[in-house]
Amino acid sequence: MSNNAVYAVPQVKTTKTSSKTTFHFTAGLFSGLTSSILLQPADLLKTRVQQSQNASLLPTVKAILSSPNPIRNLWRGTLPSALRTGFGSALYFTSLNALRTGLVQTNGIAPVTNSSSALPKLSNTANLATGAAARVAAGFVMMPVTVIKVRYESDYYAYRSLFGAGRDIVRTEGFRGLFSGFGATAARDAPYAGLYVLFYEQLKRRLAGLSSSSSDQQPLKSSSINFVSGGLAAGLATTITNPFDAVKTRLQLMPGRYGNMMRAVRLMVQEDGVRSLFGGLGLRITRKALSSALAWTVYEELILRAEVQWGSKGE
C-alpha cells in the first residue's frame, strides 16, 4: 500500500480555483486566529520568563493568578497577538503556496492532488528554502505589531493601551523602534520555518509508512497525521532556534541596552550564563507544538475541503 493510500482524503479534481490565493489567505487567517487566541497565556508567560533570567515560571504564574483580574491578565495582549499571528499566518501560507507552486511549475513537476497536504510536494532543500523565505517576508510586514505586542505583554512597561504603546515607541525611538529585533527575528524565523516545513513533510511520510505497515489497524486520518507531525516538527525546530528567540525578546524589550544581536548575546551570556539563551524553552515548545499542530491541521483541512467543493462545482 502506498503512503498516500493511508490518508482518508477524497480525490480532488484540479481546477483553476484550487490554487486561488483567497483560499490560502482565508485558511491561514482562520488557523492563525484560532491558535493565537487559545494559546495566548503561554505566549504571555514566555515573554515574562524571557525578559529576565531572574524570572521563573511558577512565581510568574502565581503573581498573575493572585492579581485582581487573573483571567484578563493571562490574555493580556490577545489583540496584537491575534492580529500578528492571524494575518502573519495568512501572509505566510499564501506566500508559501505561491513559492512552492511556482517551483512546481518551473520544474515541470506534476501537482499532487491525493494526499493529506494542501501543498505541492518538493525536495528537502526546496522545503527548507521556501519555508524560510515565506516566513521572513511575513515577519517583516508584521514586525511593528510584534514589537507592540511584546512591549504590551511585558511588565517592564506600564502601557494602558496598544495605541499608547505604539505612540510611545515612535515618540522615543522613531519608526525604527517598531522594527526592533528584526534581525534576531529573521535569524530565528528563517531557520525555524525552513526546518519546520522540512521536518513536517518528512514526519508525515514516516507516519504514513508506519500506518500502512500495520494492516490490522484502521488507517490514520489525514488530520491526525497532520496534527502529530505538526507538533513534533515544531518541537524539533523550536529547540534548535530558541537562542534567537531569547535574544529577540531582549532586543525588543530593551533595544537601547542590548543594541544588536552580537551585543545582546554577549551581555546575556556574561550576566546570566548560556542558560539565558534557552529561557522560556519549555513554554515555547509547548506553545509552538500546539499552535503549529493546530494551525497547520486547520489550514490543510480547510484547503482540502475548499478544493473538493470548488472542484466538484467545476465538473
Swiss-Prot record:
Topology within the bilayer: Multi-pass membrane protein
Keyword hit for Acetylation: no
The keyword Transmembrane helix is assigned to this record: yes
Cited Gene3D superfamilies: Mitochondrial carrier domain
Primary residence: mitochondrion
Record keywords: Membrane, Mitochondrion, Mitochondrion inner membrane, Repeat, Transmembrane, Transmembrane helix, Transport
GO cellular component, one term: mitochondrial inner membrane
SUPFAM superfamilies in alphabetical order: Mitochondrial carrier
BP-aspect Gene Ontology terms: glycine import into mitochondrion; heme biosynthetic process
One GO MF term attached to the UniProt entry: glycine transmembrane transporter activity
Transmembrane stretches, start-end: 25-50, 77-103, 128-153, 181-204, 225-251, 280-298
Reaction equations catalysed: glycine(in) = glycine(out)
Subcellular localization: Mitochondrion inner membrane
Highest taxon in the source lineage: Eukaryota
Solcar repeat feature ranges: 19-102, 125-206, 221-305
Function: Mitochondrial glycine transporter that imports glycine into the mitochondrial matrix. Plays an important role in providing glycine for the first enzymatic step in heme biosynthesis, the condensation of glycine with succinyl-CoA to produce 5-aminolevulinate (ALA) in the mitochondrial matrix.
Family, as annotated: Belongs to the mitochondrial carrier (TC 2.A.29) family. SLC25A38 subfamily.
Protein name per the record: Mitochondrial glycine transporter
The organism's taxonomic lineage, starting at the top: Eukaryota, Fungi, Dikarya, Ascomycota, Pezizomycotina
